[in-house]
Amino acid sequence: VSSRPAMMGFYDATRSKQRTLSEESQKVMKQLSGPMTITTYVNIFDKEFDVASPKEQKEDMARFKMYTRFKPEIKMEYVYYYSTPKDSALYRQYPNKNIREIAYEVAKKKNFNPQKLKSAEELKEKIDLAKENYRFVRVVERGSGEQARLRLFDDMEYHPSETEISAALKKMLVTPVKVGAITGHQERSTTKKGDQDYSLFATHGRFRYSMINQGFDLVELNLKDMNDIPSNINILLIAEMRSSMSSKEQEIIDRFLERGGNMMIMGDVGRQEVMNPLLRKVGLKLLPGI
């Protein structure tokens, strides 16, 4: 009897094979040749520290058991670090102490060896954790260098499901679909978190169904600064323009559509004059009141 994936046998006795990866995910795993490492970065100040603390590592590793079944050479590593905003309440809670000293105090309270902690600055050459808001994140890396990220989500399920994990792994095999979000006309932002913006479905790392967590890449494009849309853009996202495009910008979009590009358009009430010149190109128009 062994607990090492390479030495284990598996048999799924469930009627619907719910303890086994789907056929599509199995195909992805077969293509991922060579070594693979999943590195989990955990902030000592993060409320999710206990998800992958040293005493919880075995349980955490078990979350990937369906994947190690098909690729037993997967290695899992854990990096513990510290970082917090300069206006954090921790500075009031621990007066006259710097961030490192506070981290050591918190580590001791959590029965964690503070000597194992690194600062986010020390890790910056390998990963910019600021882009993850210093929250829990995993980096999946192949021996050939390709990388993908896995995050926890602010919902009831919390952990990524097979859908999100396989979507991340697939990004290391094929060029992900790239979405270009048009800017420059007071469109709804795909990065800001305001009520009127679209970051939740586009780039929010903690939202399970955001584009970046479902296998897409997204970049912003200002057509005023361009002569053509890059060839690696597959989809254009135009999110409720408030000012009209120039003839040059219209021509750029026309060429994109002629080469077979796709477009996702959202238009708000009362924007017919702004949106219809663009929509006419594809045989559509917004009617009054729509």
Question: Could you say what each language-model-derived stretch is?
Answer:
Residues 1-290:
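Short, surface-exposed patches at the edges or C-terminal ends of soluble domains, predominantly
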